[in-house]
């Protein structure tokens, strides 16, 4: 086995790189074709999701394989090799198997334990089979990865730790409120009708939204999804389909929108979102910005700070207001001053420091020294009264962007009245998510399955050699029986049959123990050399061994094709 995987994912690359390194369906086909056409690779499969791109191949040379696969990924993803290389990871042989099995179990997902990846692995295998780029190794690998993932979900509680990306995103939008309570009665807009969008629509319907509107470039798919939602037994939701050009109008009615399309450009711009929520909160849509420093003194007016509970602009403009001595409290009662001090103390050091010039620091020190000289001690610092800040209003529109590259302009984050959760913010949130205790059990399952797969592959590697040995032994028996017929032409059929059976039994008994034992030894780590030893000891023709191996590959391919045909029926 010379399995190699080269890829990048949300764990190795920033979202800005991932969203540019996406592969369309056509690009995946071309990538697979170019990979098997390259010299080092004989098999290839690509696993491409919104959070990862991985190219699996059976290669005969490690270093040449890494170079070739990295170059092909760069060419077909549209990101230059120099820029892409720092974010690529490489796994080889058993480590590559361990990686895919971990991915299949959801251990490497952005949301640990999510089960959607199994469907994506199944699709990757189906594509490779359809293009005939998956041979025995990758067929066995991906099939066992699927079995491992299913075993992990059935034998452990990893599902309790794992959620779909949709569910996790909705939890982030609900901001601590139960999704069902948050979603109940809302109007939802789902942009796209693929697998992720369909899951989003179904999840929202089960959560209790009043209406789901599906917009898609292919009207039939949107209408079919709307029909499925309407006819579902577990939901009571109004669902309808609209064309993509109706999205701006529908967005003005929606309380929550989920977008996951394959578009290469933005589906929702910041301007479109701002227009959709204009007037919902009773005020024009504003942009969250840092208040710029005043040009005169380099300081923003005290009352203009975001979150400050007091407006000190009037006091600051009053005669006698300064930062020195008793004049500092002119026009301001003590409670007001301490409330403002409490707010300042809770602020960041950077903000406090940025508002102090050297002149201000000097005045403060002078004032403190004068107070100590007059009173003989430092003034006590009274505990300020807690400041009650007015709660911010709930956003008028909640947006969930699950596309890669992004569907919704990142500038929407800065719009007041709008809450946007995208892949980047999900990655940050998931980094702090607690791991379930069952994850350790899943890791043990992965380790067991990796060991079993390695043993099976090593045993399979020696099987053509054993078959060639038994074929050679059968040929020897046939030749010797033919020679016996020439020497003893008077033998009748019964005698000839008994002699033939006796010779075959002798040969089989002589070969049985060595061939069984050599398969056991070959299945152990480091057992790859036993096939070579067997070929050398019995002087087996390499071409005969290769012919047996090719025949096995054809049988595997035929079995796979028949299974696919039965699935279509």
From Swiss-Prot:
The active site is at 50 (nucleophile). One of its GO terms (biological process) is protoporphyrinogen IX biosynthetic process from glutamate. The keyword Lyase does not apply. The keyword Transport does not apply. CDD domains: NAD_bind_Glutamyl_tRNA_reduct. It holds the Pfam family Shikimate_DH. PROSITE patterns: GLUTR. Substrate binds at residues 49-52, 109, 114-116, 120. Belongs to the glutamyl-tRNA reductase family. Possesses an unusual extended V-shaped dimeric structure with each monomer consisting of three distinct domains arranged along a curved 'spinal' alpha-helix. The N-terminal catalytic domain specifically recognizes the glutamate moiety of the substrate. The second domain is the NADPH-binding domain, and the third C-terminal domain is responsible for dimerization. Homodimer. This is Glutamyl-tRNA reductase.
């Amino acid at each position: 086995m010379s399995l190699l995987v080269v890829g990048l994912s949300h764990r190795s690359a920033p979202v800005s790189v991932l969203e540019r390194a996406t592969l369309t369906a056509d690009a995946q086909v071309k990538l697979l074709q170019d990979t098997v056409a390259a010299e080092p690779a004989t098999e290839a499969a690509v696993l491409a999701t919104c959070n990862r791109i991985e190219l699996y191949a059976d290669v005969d040379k490690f270093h040449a394989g890494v170079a070739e696969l990295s170059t092909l990924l760069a060419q077909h993803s549209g990101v230059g090799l120099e820029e892409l290389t720092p974010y690529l990871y490489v796994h080889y042989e058993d480590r590559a198997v361990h990686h895919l099995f971990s991915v299949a179990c959801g251990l490497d997902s952005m949301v640990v334990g999510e089960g959607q990846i199994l469907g994506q692995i199944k699709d990757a295998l189906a594509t490779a089979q359809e293009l005939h780029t998956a041979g025995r190794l990758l067929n066995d690998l991906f099939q066992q990865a699927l079995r491992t993932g299913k075993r992990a979900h059935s034998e452990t509680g990893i599902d309790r730790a794992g959620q779909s990306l949709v569910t996790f995103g909705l939890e982030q939008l609900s901001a601590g409120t139960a999704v069902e309570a948050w979603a109940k009665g809302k109007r939802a807009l789902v942009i796209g009708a693929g697998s992720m969008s369909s899951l989003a629509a179904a999840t929202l319907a089960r959560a209790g939204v009043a209406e789901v509107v599906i917009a898609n470039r292919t009207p039939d798919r949107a209408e079919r999804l709307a029909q499925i939602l309407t006819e579902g037994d577990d939901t009571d939701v109004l669902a309808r389909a609209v064309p993509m050009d109706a999205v701006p109008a529908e967005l003005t009615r929606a309380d929550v929108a989920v977008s996951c399309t394959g578009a290469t450009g933005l589906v929702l711009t910041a301007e479109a979102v701002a227009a959709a929520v204009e007037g919902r909160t009773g005020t024009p849509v504003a942009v969250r910005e840092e208040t710029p420093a005043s040009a005169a003194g380099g300081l923003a007016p005290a009352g203009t700070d975001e979150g400050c509970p007091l407006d000190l602009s009037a006091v600051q403009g009053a005669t006698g207001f300064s930062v020195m001595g008793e004049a500092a409290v002119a026009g301001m009662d003590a409670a007001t001053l301490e409330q403002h001090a409490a707010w300042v103390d809770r602020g960041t050091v950077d903000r406090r420091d940025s508002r102090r010039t050297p002149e201000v620091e000097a005045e403060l020190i002078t004032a403190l020294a004068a107070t100590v000289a007059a009173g003989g001690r430092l003034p006590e610092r009274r505990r300020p009264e807690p400041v009650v800040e007015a709660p911010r209003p709930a956003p008028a529109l909640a947006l969930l962007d699950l596309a890669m590259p992004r569907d919704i302009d990142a500038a929407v984050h800065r719009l007041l009245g709008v809450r946007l959760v995208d892949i980047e913010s999900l990655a940050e949130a998931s980094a702090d998510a607690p791991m379930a205790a069952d994850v350790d059990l899943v890791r043990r399952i992965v380790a067991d399955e990796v060991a079993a797969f390695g043993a099976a592959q090593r045993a399979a590697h020696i099987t053509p050699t054993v078959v060639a040995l038994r074929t050679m032994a059968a040929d020897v028996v046939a030749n010797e029986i033919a020679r016996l017929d020439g020497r003893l032409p008077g033998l009748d059929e019964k005698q000839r049959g008994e002699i033939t059976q006796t010779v075959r039994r002798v040969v089989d008994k002589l070969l049985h123990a060595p061939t069984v034992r050599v398969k056991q030894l070959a299945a152990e780590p480091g057992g790859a050399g036993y096939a070579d030893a067997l070929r050398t000891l019995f002087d087996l023709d390499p071409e005969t061994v290769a012919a047996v191996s090719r025949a096995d590959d054809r049988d595997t391919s035929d079995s796979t094709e028949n299974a696919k045909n039965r699935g279509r029926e």
